[in-house]
């Protein structure tokens, strides 16, 4: 296997990975495939969603602008990336099933300190209010974004809706209005 992988270019390996992913997850709702053990998980991801074997609860899900950008060949292009599209497709599948709504976010804050951008999981420091644990430089805008995100996630955990009482800035993602909340510092 090692020799085979070393004889191929990264682009070839990535292309083959995407082909295989398309085979095991044809709807491309989300890019992670569970391990079906026939005990805890008795069916695949697509079957669970399309047959309504998932909980009827509100969902909040999203991606970052530079998700999964380990190598230039693998770097997703923002809204064109598979994770971004998968979040929208998941929301639309819930709507088709008549389920509670999904709220989708797109974290675009390019973190300061290097050129990694808004990399996978970079939103977590903001969401959990742990910016001070990061070595990266921050601005007042970063702390304001963190407070906004903590409020949104707290509201969602309490009510199933990220909006504070009396507000409706963050809309559910639906077929008629595929809304995605962009999270970044205010300029």
Regions found by a protein language model. Give the residues of each.
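Single conserved hydrophobic/aromatic residue that forms the stacking wall/gate
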Residues: 1-14
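Short, flexible, glycine/charge-rich loop motifs used to bind or transfer phosphoryl groups or to couple energy/partner
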Residues: 3-4, 47-51
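Short glycine- and Lys/Arg-enriched binding-loop motifs that mark or flank ligand-binding interfaces
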Residues: 7, 34, 58
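C-terminal helix-and-tail extensions that cap enzymatic domains
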Residues: 12, 17-29, 50-187
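Mobile cap/lid helix-loop segments that gate and shape the active-site cleft of serine hydrolases
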Residues: 23-48
């Amino acid at each position: 296997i090692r020799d085979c992988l070393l004889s191929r270019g990264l682009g070839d390996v990535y292309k083959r990975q995407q082909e295989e992913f398309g085979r095991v997850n044809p709807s491309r709702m989300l890019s992670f495939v569970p391990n079906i053990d026939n005990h805890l998980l008795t069916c695949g991801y697509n079957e669970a969603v399309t047959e309504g074997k998932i909980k009827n609860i509100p969902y909040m899900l999203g991606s970052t602008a530079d998700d999964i950008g380990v190598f230039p060949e693998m770097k997703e292009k923002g809204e064109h990336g598979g994770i971004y599209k998968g979040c929208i497709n998941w929301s639309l599948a819930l709507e088709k099933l008549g389920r509670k709504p999904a709220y989708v976010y797109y974290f675009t804050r390019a973190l300061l300190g290097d050129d990694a951008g808004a990399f996978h999981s970079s939103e977590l420091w903001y969401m959990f209010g742990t910016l001070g644990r990061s070595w990266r430089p921050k601005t007042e805008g970063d702390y304001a974004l963190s407070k906004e995100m903590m409020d949104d996630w707290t509201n969602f955990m309490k009510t199933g809706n990220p909006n504070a009482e009396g507000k409706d800035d963050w809309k559910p993602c639906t077929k008629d209005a595929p809304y995605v909340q962009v999270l970044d510092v205010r300029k």
